[in-house]
């Protein structure tokens, strides 16, 4: 008998962030495993197809969201959740072989055995890096979602330990299932890079790169301050390239980069589609990711898979992901980060070593294994 997996696929609606990538890669692998029958919920629309773009009928959900959000933000979150929950429950069949997987923190209240993926606890650890209305809503609802779940999945062992400590759960109720870089993330051949980088006006090996949504938690301000302390000659030759869509509270970042943008030393690319990222990673002289807090941290792993030497902060899950395959610095140590960037930019031998070690480490992470371990969680909660 097939296992029916009811999956809230709303994070797949473009543009996809890290959670959207998690959904797409996990479900793509699960579809290739026999005995799994997936069903996808797209914010009010059910489908048995794994969609890579938003269906047009989702526009009604977006209109509803905009309308209620104009009233009271906290109320808007609650109304959206209840409205979607009702539509979700209309499409499920409660059988002896069915499970509901919520990949994005807050589970609907359903009669099915429930698995929730909690990617991080940044809403509790760094509330100042989130909008106030989101903090208010999530702080109250996240605990309810976690306690309601039959099993909680964390992206890392670091995250698992945080959840266990915060919510005082039995160890068997929380499982760490590591993520991976997508199959498209691999080194791009040197002869192909000029054409791939031309739309961004970049040359292979001649830029420092950072990728991620622009928001306070990503700590790009520290990275920019560190870059600004590099010798002028380096900055004139090797710009700092920032790829990622705007999140919130970017005014400080905008002020920080204005002068360097004017000099051409910082390039902001905005949102970069998934298919363009391997080329960007492969051509980077150095990849920098000084995040204050991550539940996993996909961009450094993607960068390593593409052969970019990486520098990350030594906080949260990032040491677990990168290990000794990259340089680690304190997230708020501007001088330390500047020193690491300067060293890696100028040391050909170190870059080559980290490039090789990074590619080898990235091979140890697999979406197939992620899917198999997630499926084991499904079967565990279904059988009780």
Stretches with model-predicted labels:
Residues 1-384:
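Carbohydrate transferase catalytic cores enriched for Leloir-type hexosyltransferases
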